[in-house]
């Protein structure tokens, strides 16, 4: 059975090369890849990541090669089924209860039980987690508790977690509820 990577993408746009580069490596190594987005919508590449004439303002130069632009356009094409039907994180992972809920303790017990079930029945089948960057993750991944739960679950299971560009901010905000410190604390 091939190893499987879970790739989380923003519904507000991902930087094309940050998906295409790892995906080419995963495909070449024979890995199976599953995609996930916050609500199960098909992710889309940010248009500058498909434009070889785009000049990155801080760098003052073009940052997208023609070959990469074509590869990003190919995977972003709605006719390409590869990114269709990503896993829906909202439907897959439980919502953490509000601290002010009158039934907070019981709701937290149920939340942890559901999270344990997802970890034991679903996440154990994955070998690694990748969070793709671009500006979109700032909108719908960085403060997304379900993304944090994925990160913490993979970490708890001793499985690799990788993030690119703005996707790294998800790691900074993934905190253990016990000590409230970021998993990046002290690193």
Predicted segments, located by residue:
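Active-site cofactor/cluster-binding pocket
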Residues: 160
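Extended, subdomain-level signal for the structured scaffold at the beginning of enzyme domains
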Residues: 1-157, 170-187
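Short, thiol/selenol-centered motifs that function as redox-active sites or metal-ligating centers
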Residues: 164-169
């Amino acid at each position: 059975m091939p190893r499987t990577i879970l790739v989380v993408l923003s519904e507000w746009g991902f930087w094309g090369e940050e998906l295409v580069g790892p995906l080419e490596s995963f495909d070449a190594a024979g890995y199976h890849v599953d995609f996930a987005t916050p609500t199960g919508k098909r992710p889309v590449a940010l248009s500058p990541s498909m434009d070889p004439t785009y000049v990155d303002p801080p760098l003052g130069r073009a940052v997208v090669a023609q070959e990469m632009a074509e590869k990003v356009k190919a995977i972003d094409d709605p006719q390409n089924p590869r990114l269709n039907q990503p896993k829906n994180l909202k439907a897959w992972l439980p919502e953490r209860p509000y601290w002010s809920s009158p039934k907070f303790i019981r709701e937290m017990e149920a939340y942890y039980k559901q999270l344990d079930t997802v970890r034991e029945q679903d996440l154990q089948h994955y070998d690694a987690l990748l969070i793709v960057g671009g500006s979109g993750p700032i909108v719908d991944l960085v403060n997304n508790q379900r993304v944090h739960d994925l990160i913490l679950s993979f970490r708890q299971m001793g499985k690799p977690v990788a993030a690119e560009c703005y996707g790294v901010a998800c790691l900074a905000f993934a905190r253990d509820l016990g000590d409230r410190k970021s998993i990046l604390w002290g690193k």
